[in-house]
Every structure is written in C-alpha cells, then in structure tokens.
C-alpha cells in the first residue's frame, strides 16, 4: 500500500532497534505507519501498539498494517496520555517521530501550509484551539512570547505589530494571507520561506508540542524499559530530549556545588546510544527534503 508520507531516518531507526527480540514496541506517533511497518517486518516476534491523535492517519495505518493484525493494535489520543496506560507491558522499544506528516502539510484543508485557504494547524482536528484563534485572538504580548520562545524569531515584536495592524482591518482567516503578510515584510534567507519560523511557533502553541513531548518523556523515564528513540525537527525539541537523556544517564544526583558525592553514585537509568544526534544522509535529504531538519537521539534503559 503506497503511503502519502515518507518516514524519515527509517534505516537509522531499524539499526537502533535491531537488538530487540520479544515484547511490545510502542510507536508513539504512528502517522501513516512507515516506521511501524518496517519494525513489524524486521521483528516477527514483536507486538506493536501505534498511537496517534489524527483519525485520518489511524484509518490509513489500519489498512496498511492489516497484514500484521495479529501483532498490531492502535490507540487514538495524545501519546502523553496513552503511554501511562501501558506501563505494565513488557516494553522492548519506544519510538516517537515528533513532526508534521507530509500529508498534513500538503492537505490544504488542514491549514498547515503557506498556501492553505484555512488557518488551522491542529494535528487533532477535534481539538478546540486552532491557529485561527491564536493569530486573531491572542493579545500582543502573548503572541510575542510565542514567536520569541517557539520560533526563536529575533524580530518578534515587528512581526506581532504587523499582525496587530492587519487584525484591525479584519480577521486573518487563511494561512496564505498570513504567509503573504510576513513575506512582504521579512526577507527570505536562502531557500527558507520567511514565514517558516512563525508557522512553527503557532503550530507548537496550537498542539502544545513541547508540553506533549515533555510529559511523554517524563512517563518514559518512569517506565524505564527497553530502547527509546526520539526524532525531532527543531532545536527546542532536540534540546528537551537531550536534557532528559542526560538526566537519565546521570549516576550522581548530588548538586554541582557538593564537595563530594553522598548519593551513592549509582542512579543512572541506562546509557545514551547516540553521542550526537543522527541525521539524514545526503541521499535521503535529496529524496525527501523534509528529512533535512530531522535529528534522532536514542537511549537504552538498564534491564
């Protein structure tokens, strides 16, 4: 079954999870099933649970993974909410690919792309908050904080001022109108559209992406089983993953100013498998340009 989405770093994912044999594999971001299909094919003794909050993606994946129906099941919802319900399972591996799928980006009705007639950006179409409310209803100081923190936009004040002036004329109702507004006043850097970081910031706010991955990592640390691999697409997420992995690998819990260790120096939960994040090969980057910003980190908990 042909997928509308190319899974990033698929070979690297398979390599990280190659030692797995039996147990459960949790795909926290099932999407269109590319990673899950590869794992199920490579590990005939693994059972897999796929999680996603997008009903369209789940519908597609159920059909794609039908040949593995005896070893595959799914849960609809946020992975930060589903993971705690799986704690008692013999988990061998956990994967999370934190990004927007190609189908979500390319489907104009979802309001993610620069040319969309809608301004939406909800990964879960049934969620209450959308980009329309963020752009048109948030006060200026809150918008500025979002652009500064989630988009790391240096001229966030200028951007908010432009949006505020535009709102006086009427509601901004399409992603295309917003991207054109930004394009008129901000320069393109290389091949990067000037609205890229602003759209990223709005999407993160709409879907609570940083809160979601933070809560999930907290739960994964409590589960403390098997191998974990996280694929992120921007520096904020990657930094969060890096810090959690570092915390899990710390043997000493004493404060930095402590004269000597008094905690026993035996608190590490496991080891970091990737000293530096794995990135797409030149071949993959060329075949799938959206893989260029992908970074994968992996960790193994002590058995």
From Swiss-Prot:
EC numbers, comma separated: 2.1.1.199
Transmembrane helix found in the keyword field: no
Catalytic activity: cytidine(1402) in 16S rRNA + S-adenosyl-L-methionine = N(4)-methylcytidine(1402) in 16S rRNA + S-adenosyl-L-homocysteine + H(+)
Residues reported in the UniProt entry to bind S-adenosyl-L-methionine: 33-35, 52, 79, 97, 104
GO biological process: rRNA base methylation
GO molecular function: rRNA (cytosine-N4-)-methyltransferase activity
GO cellular component: cytoplasm
Location in the cell: Cytoplasm
One Pfam family cited in the UniProt record for this chain: Methyltransf_5
Keywords attached to this entry: Cytoplasm, Methyltransferase, rRNA processing, S-adenosyl-L-methionine, Transferase
Annotated function: Specifically methylates the N4 position of cytidine in position 1402 (C1402) of 16S rRNA.
Family to which this protein belongs: Belongs to the methyltransferase superfamily. RsmH family.
The protein's name: Ribosomal RNA small subunit methyltransferase H
């Amino acid at each position: 079954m042909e997928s509308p989405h190319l899974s990033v770093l698929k070979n690297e994912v398979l390599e990280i999870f190659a030692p797995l044999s039996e147990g459960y594999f949790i795909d926290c971001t099932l999407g269109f099933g590319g990673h899950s299909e590869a794992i199920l094919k490579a590990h005939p003794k693994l059972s897999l649970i796929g999680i996603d909050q997008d009903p369209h993606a789940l519908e597609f994946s159920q059909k794609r993974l039908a040949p593995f129906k005896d070893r595959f099941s799914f849960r609809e919802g946020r992975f930060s909410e589903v993971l705690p319900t799986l704690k008692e399972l013999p988990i061998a591996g956990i994967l999370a690919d934190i990004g927007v799928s190609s189908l979500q980006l390319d489907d104009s009705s979802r309001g993610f792309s620069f040319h969309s007639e809608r301004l939406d950006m909800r990964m879960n179409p049934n969620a209450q908050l959308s980009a329309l409310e963020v752009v048109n209803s948030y006060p200026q100081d809150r918008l500025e904080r979002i652009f500064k923190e989630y988009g790391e936009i240096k001229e966030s004040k200028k951007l908010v001022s432009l949006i505020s002036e535009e709102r006086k004329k009427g509601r901004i109702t399409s992603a295309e109108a917003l991207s054109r507004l930004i394009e008129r006043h901000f320069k393109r850097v290389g091949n990067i559209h000037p609205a890229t970081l602003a759209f990223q910031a709005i999407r993160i706010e709409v879907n609570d992406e940083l809160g979601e991955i933070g809560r999930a990592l907290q739960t994964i640390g409590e589960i403390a089983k098997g191998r974990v691999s996280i694929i992120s697409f921007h520096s904020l997420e990657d930094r969060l993953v890096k810090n959690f992995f570092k915390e899990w690998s710390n043997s000493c819990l004493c404060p930095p100013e402590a004269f000597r260790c008094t905690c026993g120096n035996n608190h590490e939960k496991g080891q970091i498998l990737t000293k530096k994040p794995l990135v797409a090969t030149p071949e993959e980057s060329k075949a799938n340009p959206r893989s260029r910003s992908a970074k994968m980190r992996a960790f193994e908990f002590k058995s």
